[in-house]
Amino acid sequence: AIPFCLWQTKDNNHRISLMANSIKHLPHHNNCIQVESDEDLRRSVTEHSIDAVVLRYSLDNLNIAEDLPSNVMVIMWSHNFIKRTELSRLAKDRRITCIVCVGNEQLQMYRDHQAFYKSVAIYNGYPINHFIRTQSCHISPFENRSNEVTFLGNLVDYKGFHLLAKAWKKILEAVPDAHLNVIGGGKLYDRNQKLGIWGIAEESFENMFMPYLLGDDGRLLPSVTFHGVMGNEKAAILNRTKVGVPNPSGISETFCIAALEMQLYGAIISTISYGGFKDTVYKTGDLYETPDRLAESVVKQLKKTDNDYSGVLDFVRLFDFSTVTKKWIELFDTLQQTGNIDSILKPKPTKEYRLAEWNRKFKRIIPFGSLLPSSMFYKSIFHRISSLLHKYACRKHNYPRI
């Protein structure tokens, strides 16, 4: 959506072209270019005298970037955490002018890596202002909501639903009338995925979380509803949700649209203090440090009586498309004037990332310092080991066969 918004922006300083493998469904526009192959891209860049190309980061696109004309600035737009080896390649590649992260926390993780010097943060976007104009007046008052908890996301292990499933019976002990809505499924992004016997998620993952949600009779707890993959109809569920739980593992979350969406519908958030959640969750949310605090966090949130909805709306405007596209235009202005991003101010290190900032400065002054691992590398390894231990604990218990 952001490329489309940029394409429609009335900007006298830049000619913004939208490249796509099919343009027949796009509005007629002189700056809409059909690109069906790598060769099409290279030819179009030359024919249309394009100065800079924005590519969504992937190894394939990195290889494509290396074949573009040497005078073309390449901006890599990274929606996911980048592996350290790939980050080093980006840092050394002179063709790559800029790496755009979709959140400040993602950028902070690269603070003591060489790639930090060519990286900036521009938030991902959402039609916030449109939602506020058309939907905010229909949002149910928080005090009128029952104890509904909602998970919104893909049912795969790295999205952490098994952690919420494991915590659910403990939540019920404290709040007996709580109800869990699960929106999403194992086929959210892969329609060909083979599902388990419950038809909910891939078999091995389904077998990991389902035992936590079954009663003594082997049937699904009445307090749990799997809604499957939903479109606009999910609005009715979100509008009665009290606590939203997006990806309680935090793995892969550089931004999290689901957190924004649930807050727009009036829910307060309970999830781990990691990655994009630190950017996208308002102060009414509860960000815990370790997954074993999930049940405690949800119970605490369910007992709240106010969601400060007006404060939420002020907070989320930061992520509206209009604000985000302005940041992109500012980046284009800087690159046009200087050819690099040296003049763009980087966010100051947070308390958590001061060690990374010290490490960055230390590595600059010692011989071969750039070869030392970044603190991001160690933190990522620790976080993944922690998640694997929790997954192992889920599988260790002897559950009834399902």
Predicted regions and their residues:
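Short His-centered aromatic/hydrophobic patch
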Residues: 55-60
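A short, active-site helix/loop in glycosyltransferases that binds the activated sugar's phosphate group
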Residues: 85-90, 95-121, 126-133, 328
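Conserved donor-binding/catalytic core segment of Leloir-type glycosyltransferases
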Residues: 100, 133, 139-172, 180-183
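Nucleotide-activated donor-binding/catalytic signature segment of Leloir-type glycosyltransferases, i.e.
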Residues: 193-229
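Acidic donor-binding loop of glycosyltransferase active sites
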Residues: 223, 239-254
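Short hydrophobic beta-strand element within catalytic cores of glycosyltransferases
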Residues: 264-271
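C-terminal amphipathic helix plus adjacent low-complexity
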Residues: 317-402
